[in-house]
Regions:
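A beta-strand edge to alpha-helix "cap/lid" segment located at domain peripheries
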Residues: 4, 13, 35, 49-116
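Low-complexity, compositionally biased segments
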Residues: 7, 20-23, 41, 96, ...
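Short, flexible segments with low predicted structural confidence
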Residues: 19-20, 40-41, 67-68, 74
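A short gly/proline-enriched turn/hairpin at secondary-structure junctions
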Residues: 33-42
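Short, low-complexity N-terminal intrinsically disordered segments enriched in polar/charged residues
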Residues: 1-30, 115
Length: 116
């Protein structure tokens, strides 16, 4: 499977940075899974959009893709997240898409020590 992850990552992070919860959720498969850094798993667009709506109501960090690597239907993205307090926090997102190009699984990792 050949998939344009560069385009998908741009769309995903543009939606995140605009605080567009519905736009983010639309990128997921109906039964997509979001795995948070603490291991919590959210399944289905309804649960995922509610999570992003909650996050968007708060002061949202601003992630930027530093680099990514894709292979088939999977992609690993190294992120640098600008936090509301001005610090920068390394993170990584691991995506898997289905045959329709929708996110079927996203696992988020966050480094607990901000960069200086």
């Amino acid at each position: 499977m050949s998939f344009d992850f560069e385009k998908m990552l741009k769309t995903y992070f543009d939606c995140v940075n605009r605080q567009d919860a519905e736009g983010v959720a639309a990128l997921y498969a109906d039964d997509g899974v979001l795995i948070l850094p603490d291991g919590t798993q959210l399944q289905g667009r309804t649960a995922i959009v509610e999570f992003y709506r909650t996050v968007c109501k708060q002061s949202v960090p601003a992630p930027r893709v530093a680099s990514f690597f894709a292979n088939g239907n999977q992609c690993a993205a190294e992120l640098l997240v600008s936090m509301p307090d001005g610090s920068r926090q390394p993170a990584a997102d691991f995506f898997r898409v289905d045959a329709a190009g929708k996110i079927e699984r996203l696992r988020i990792y966050v480094c607990l020590k901000p960069e200086t």
